[in-house]
Structure formats: C-alpha cells, structure tokens
Amino acid sequence: MGGRSRNCGLAVALLAMVSVPVMAQTCTTQAKMASDTRTALANEALLLGSAVKAGDANAVKAATVAEYASNFAPIEHAVDTTSEKLKGDTLRVTQVYLLDASTRKAGDTSDTEFTCPLKDTTSETDFSFSSLPPGVYGFAMVEAAGGDRSWLLSFLLLQQGSGWKMAGFYPHPRTAVGKDGLWYWTAARANVKAKMPWLAWVQYDEANELLRPASFVSSTDLDKLLAEQRAGAPPALSDGISVQTPLVVKGTGVQEFHFTAIANEQAGDGGSLHLVLHYAAEPLAGAEPNRVRDAAAAEAMIKAHPELRQGYGTVIVFADMPGQNPSVLSLPMTEIR
C-alpha cells in the first residue's frame, strides 16, 4: 500500500533510494556458500537474535558496526520493543546470503543490486541498495516461532577482519491476527474474484508486509504478488496511493478528502485488525473541529467502499498536516454510519 511501511529497518542512510546507474555485484546463496562462511554468518545472526530476544541491547551494541553503535538509540528502542514480542519463541536461522561488494569504490553513490538464483528452481531473491560502501556483507534471516506470535529478525552483517558486525536490523511480525502472509495472499485473490477489489488491495499489501524480509529485498514470488495486486486494483488505485497520487473521496456537501494511504494495523493484543487511513489536511483551531473532520473522513471512505468494513473493528484516521504532528482519531466501526 502506497505510503506505508511497518518495517523497522535501522540500517541506514546507506539504503536510501536514488535514481542513478545500477552496479551488479556477487551474491552467493547458502546452498553454494562455503560451509565455514555459512556457519559463521548463521552463528552471528543467532547470537544477535538471542540478544534481541533477551532484551540485551548492550550485547547488540557490542556487535554493531561503529557508525551505528555511536548513535545507538534507535536500535536500542527496536531491541526493547521487539524483545517483548518474542517471549516463548524459539529462534532458528532459515536463510543466509553472502553479498560481495568489495570491488565498489569508496564514495560511489550508484545503486548496487545482487541477484541470487535459488538452487534447482527458476526463482531468485534480489537485493537493491544505494550508496552501499565497499565490503563483504551477509544477510541473515532468523525466524522466531512457537510463542504467541511469529516474528522474523533479519540482519545485515558486514565482514570486519575475520568476524562479522551488524550493519542493519529489520524485525517484523510474520502473522497478523494469527494469519500468515500466504493466508492474506489467498484471501486477496478470493476477494478479487468476489468483486471486492478494495478489500483485496489491503490484503495484498498485508501479505507483502508479512512476507518481505526487508524493504530492499525482493523475490520472484513477491514480484508475482505485486503484479497480482496491480492487476486486481480498483481503477482509482491503478497508480497506487501516495502523497503524490492521493485517492480523492467525496464527503458531504462540497467536502472531499485526499487519502494518501490505506493500511492494516494489528491491535496491540494481536487479537484484531485496525483499518488505518491517512489523509492530507490543513490545521484547524481546536481539538474538536479536528475530531469532527477526522470522523467525517472515515465515514466518507467507508460509505464509498463499504467492503472495507469486513474484518475490522476499528478505523484509525491520521490527518497529516504540514509542519505539525497529525491529529489521530480511533473510531469503532460500529459508530460509522
């Protein structure tokens, strides 16, 4: 869904996207990797995952590259909040990749892409970075499962001497309300066939969020998912939805709302889903006028596309205003006429 990312990626400025020439580098999958390298990457990832699960931010900091260890507060916050979600989970390293960018020149701002064909299939996993410093990197995925919720802890690792240091941490849930990404993908397909494209759009996006290890990682399957989402999109969303391409929905009278994002959000207890709406707005004087306008925005969206009522107990509306924090309204779906 345009304009939204739940991924807590913390590596960096070095991943910012720019429109410049692309440089291809070398990727080695775990099936073709030297056993000692594969073991070293997996061991480091498991140590980091165990430290995150234990809430041991000091151990994570000690294993982090100096650039991010010196400004560790965002990573420490991610460690603290993620560790709370992993109680009762067992950690297992499921995938490691070796990404060799050692031939890049220092200061090179071109894009760097790694194409990783998977053994005995026609599928591949791809990585795309920009302004990636020269070096040898590893990407490791640690699955956390067995507790109340499944999570994925992905780590970008940089080889330093004979060891590895963390250069990026990307935790995110693998399920929403007890359902995994494949479930949401299947549900989206069914709703396209059932002529409910708006609900399908949100479900495709949820599937993408749950299945994608990090924002800079793609795969043959994820490309297929996004192609299906585009093919089944309502005409109003054919160009996506974002600040640049808002969805305009009429309210009462001459009122209209410019929505910039439609998303799912799991409730804190993991037991239900919220429908999350963002729209562009100008500041109003006082809390009550903002609340009334936010409620009107939610009502306009649900009235225009009533299928979005399905599966959601609450609508959370963000009125994004220039130069200040958004106003936020949480509205039970039962209160929306």
Sequence positions of predicted segments:
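Acidic, serine/threonine- and glycine-rich low-complexity intrinsically disordered segments
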Residues: 173-255
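Short beta-strand edge/turn micro-motifs at domain boundaries
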Residues: 25, 113, 134-178, 256-286, ...
